[in-house]
């Protein structure tokens, strides 16, 4: 009987513990948390899959950074395409860090920190916002002032400093009052494009 319990516990741990990686990766615990980060070799909290956050501002597109050119800020690693971009970031990191930890801005408007897609982005008022894809971007663009207000509200009151995994779980169960399904948002976007 005891052997069965040990085997069952090991089986459960084997299934559950691999799912803990995002809990650690997205929560570096040094001031930027949660963040849209992955673990890549020695870089345990790599922002935006290694994309150069400065290039959005200087080159007006995203590009991957080099593993050889990087900075660590508040426990999060940022890679850069050029040494010049690294120097610009090091001089003013808060200017270049994506809003909402690099999570999808549209998701944050619903208090849900979904991963952001580095190639879907906007700069509003000198700040970088990442989106989860074209659909999320288009839905957010339907009412930018309202969605920015909602996203900043939920980031400040619920998401910032929380564990992204638990926050997602909470808000997938307990929806915000203005919640809309993906289909409802897609329908609104389609109507707006007519």
Show the residue positions of the predicted features.
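Bacterial N-terminal signal peptides
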Residues: 7-18
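Short, well-structured hydrophobic secondary-structure segments
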Residues: 73-82
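Extracytoplasmic
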Residues: 83-88
């Amino acid at each position: 009987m005891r052997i069965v319990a040990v085997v069952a516990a090991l089986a459960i741990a084997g299934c559950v513990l691999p799912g803990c990686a995002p809990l650690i990766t997205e929560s570096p615990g040094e001031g930027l948390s949660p963040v849209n980060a992955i673990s890549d070799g020695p870089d345990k909290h790599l922002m935006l899959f290694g994309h150069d956050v400065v290039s959005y501002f200087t080159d007006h597109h995203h590009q991957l950074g080099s593993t050889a050119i990087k900075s660590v800020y508040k426990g999060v690693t940022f890679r850069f395409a050029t040494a010049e971009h690294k120097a610009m970031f090091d001089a003013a990191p808060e200017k270049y860090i994506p809003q909402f930890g690099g999570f999808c801005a549209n998701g944050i408007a619903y208090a849900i920190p979904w991963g952001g897609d580095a190639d879907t982005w906007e700069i509003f008022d000198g700040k970088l916002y990442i989106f989860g894809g074209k659909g999320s971007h288009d839905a957010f663009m339907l009412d930018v002032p309202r969605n920015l207000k909602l996203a900043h509200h939920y980031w400040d009151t619920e998401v910032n400093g929380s564990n992204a995994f638990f926050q997602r779980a909470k808000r997938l169960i307990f929806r915000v009052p203005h919640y809309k399904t993906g289909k409802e948002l897609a329908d609104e976007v389609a109507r707006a494009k007519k």
